[in-house]
Amino acid sequence: MVAAASTYMIDGKQYVSIAVGWGGVFGLSQRVTELQSPGTVYTFAIDGKAQPPAFVKYQTEELLQGVKYDPKDVPEGTAIYVAACATCHGVPGVDKGGNVRNLGYVSAETIANLKDFVFKGPFRDQGMPDFTGKLRDEDVVKIQAFIQGTADAIRPKN
């Protein structure tokens, strides 16, 4: 539950509504189950018989690999990522992400083209900030280095 339940009556029938899912700040970058649970309001009728919908499993990519970067960019990329990205995207590859994808589990193509998402990108209508005027192209290159460098650092060695 992400909020208190509410109960009410309509035409003599009692209902209970509950907001559920991994919403709020925690749910942006974290999850505690392999099931996808977008923010939903469930309403139950007392003595109702309907079944809830089935949850689906999260679809994740493998741990990121293949993005070229200069290891010297990782330290500054870390600071920029923590300031601009970590609140929503979490630590790359350390967890599987929440309602917002963990960038350690996206395609190499996505990270290689990161500035297309950071500057006037396609997810602005879903809450992704536009970092135009706040970050520079060089900052994005350093963020890419941090993301791929972190994925490389945590990748299990065979």
Predicted features and spans:
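Conserved blade-ending motifs and adjacent loop-strand segments that build the rim/top face
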Residues: 1-12, 23
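Axial heme c-ligation environment in periplasmic c-type cytochrome domains
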Residues: 67, 96-104, 119-158
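Gly/Gly-Pro-rich "capping" loops immediately C-terminal to redox-active cysteine motifs
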Residues: 5, 90-120
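Short pre-active-site segment immediately N-terminal to redox-active cysteine/selenocysteine motifs
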Residues: 73-76, 81-87, 92, 107-110, ...
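Electrostatic cytochrome c docking/interface patches
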Residues: 57-80
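Short, conserved, GDST-rich strand-edge loop motifs in beta-rich repeat architectures
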Residues: 19-35
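Beta-propeller blade signature
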Residues: 34-47
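Entry beta-strands of beta-propeller and related beta-repeat scaffolds
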Residues: 12-18
